[in-house]
């Protein structure tokens, strides 16, 4: 009997503004749909200025069969500091939370504890800062926020904004490790692995990829990254 698998993806939408400088949320949704993922973690899903309305409208996402998890704030935002999460039917929310992050500009992370084919899975969506020092502080703040929660398999997903191999980040996340995914930035000629997954104990990646098909190369300055995950043991939390 085949072990259950789950496909998760991360995508920096660049506020649904493509390299052609056109804001086209329908095009962004076309890219998201092509990932064939059950969970999609988004960055820059809202516009920049307060009250930060959604760049990817709720109703458009829901019309495509997505459930938008409740991270939005008053004013119509899809997410928290631009971080949002979409799930397909069959994935249900058990608990969620916001995580404030330190830095030169307002940033935050989101947490969702989800019932999935793998059992209970904790997914943290993040978009770390451009300055290395603050990236490390932000990741440390995320790990502190998770420390007192009941244990379950954990995935950190998002734009880590780190052009290197992530060794310093891995020292902060302790028992987690970065899955070996391909470069995703910049979209026309990707050379940097900014968009990644960090997996906790009990999880492994069976396959991964970067969506290269059009319109992904023009819909954002990032390409979306996906990973197929499975449990390393028969136990599920």
Model regions and ranges:
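Active-site regions of metal-assisted phosphoester/phosphodiester hydrolases
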Residues: 1-39, 51, 67-237
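Glycosyltransferases and closely related glycan-assembly transferases
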Residues: 57-64
């Amino acid at each position: 009997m085949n072990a259950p698998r789950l496909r998760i993806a991360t995508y920096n939408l660049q506020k649904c503004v493509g390299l052609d400088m056109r804001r086209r949320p329908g095009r962004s949704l076309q890219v998201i749909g092509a990932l064939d993922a059950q969970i999609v973690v988004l960055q820059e899903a809202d516009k920049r200025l307060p009250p930060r309305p959604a760049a990817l409208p709720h109703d458009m996402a829901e019309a495509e069969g997505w459930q938008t998890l409740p991270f939005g704030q008053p004013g119509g935002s899809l997410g928290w500091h631009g971080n949002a999460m979409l799930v397909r039917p069959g994935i249900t929310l058990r608990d969620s939370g916001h995580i404030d992050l330190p830095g030169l500009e307002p940033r935050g992370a989101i947490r969702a504890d989800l019932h999935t084919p793998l059992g209970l899975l904790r997914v943290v969506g993040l978009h770390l800062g451009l300055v290395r020092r603050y990236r490390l502080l932000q990741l440390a703040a995320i790990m502190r926020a998770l420390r007192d929660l009941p244990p379950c398999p954990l995935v950190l997903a998002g734009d880590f904004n780190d052009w290197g191999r992530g060794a310093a980040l891995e020292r902060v996340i302790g028992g987690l490790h970065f899955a070996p995914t391909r470069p995703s930035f910049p979209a026309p000629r990707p050379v940097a692995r900014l968009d990644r997954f960090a997996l906790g104990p009990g999880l492994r990646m069976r396959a991964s990829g970067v969506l290269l098909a059009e319109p992904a190369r023009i819909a954002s300055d990032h390409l979306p990254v996906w990973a197929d995950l499975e449990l390393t043991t028969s136990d599920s939390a």
